[in-house]
């Protein structure tokens, strides 16, 4: 196995986790004020609702972990990114408290799903022998995102005047990031699961 391919794959996984965590931290750290901006909910109401839906962060680790076992890690991460892109683009125009609550719960599910999927992603790509070291390195993306995320929010809020204004910007970032799970594949393989799927469909249609 070529070392360069291993390094590129490791960097791709690191970037995938970093971007998902950055989006999650942006959202989680400002969920209550964003909910209040969008719906006009009272502070106590928004805080109580967020406290209730916070459980989806934990559930996402199990849900997306199970989904990735069935459809593959790349597809799972593509869906995690994709659902957030759609929500971050549209939620700014929604002012119904129940609907905003549902969308927020899905974002929390996606945030937890990034963590639930990445350990298996790492093991699939690099094996389990050095799992602690490999995943430990990739997990540094969490720490870096914890620094970058709040700075990103502060800059965008200064420019837009609201916390909710940061969501479409993050949606654009995640939309671009959707290329990562498409082009990333195991170091020992010649092509990724998306390319293999296209080849299979082409052969069936031929």
Put a short name on every predicted segment.
Residues 5-66, 119, 149, 153:
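Extracytoplasmic gate region of multi-pass secondary transporters
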Residues 18, 99-113:
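Hydrophobic core of transmembrane alpha-helices in multi-pass small-molecule transporters
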Residues 70-81:
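Cytoplasmic membrane-interface "Motif A"-like loop-to-helix N-cap segments
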Residues 83-95:
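C-terminal ends and interior cores of transmembrane alpha-helices
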Residues 113-126:
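Intracellular juxtamembrane helix-capping segments at the cytosolic ends
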Residues 125-160:
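A late C-terminal transmembrane helix in Major Facilitator Superfamily
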Residues 155-172:
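A membrane-interface helix-boundary motif in multi-pass transporters
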Residues 171-206:
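Multi-pass alpha-helical transporter architecture, strongest
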């Amino acid at each position: 196995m070529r070392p360069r391919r291993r390094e590129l794959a490791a960097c791709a996984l690191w970037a995938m986790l970093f971007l998902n965590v950055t989006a999650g931290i942006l959202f989680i750290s400002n969920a209550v004020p964003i909910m209040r901006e969008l719906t006009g909910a009272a502070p106590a109401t928004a805080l109580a609702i967020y406290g209730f839906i916070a459980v989806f962060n934990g559930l996402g680790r199990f849900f997306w972990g199970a989904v990735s076992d069935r459809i593959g890690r790349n597809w799972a991460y593509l869906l995690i990114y994709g659902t957030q892109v759609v929500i971050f683009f549209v939620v700014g125009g929604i002012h119904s408290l129940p609907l905003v609550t549902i969308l927020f719960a899905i974002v929390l599910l996606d945030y937890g799903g990034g963590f639930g999927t990445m350990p298996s992603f790492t093991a699939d790509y690099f094996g389990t022998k050095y799992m602690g070291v490999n995943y430990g390195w990739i997990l540094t993306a969490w720490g870096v995102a914890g620094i970058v995320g709040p700075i990103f929010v502060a800059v965008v809020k200064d420019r837009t005047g609201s916390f909710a204004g940061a969501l479409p910007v993050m949606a654009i970032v995640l939309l671009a990031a959707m290329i990562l799970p498409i082009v990333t594949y195991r170091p020992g393989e010649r092509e990724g699961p998306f390319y293999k799927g296209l080849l299979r469909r082409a052969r069936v249609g031929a």
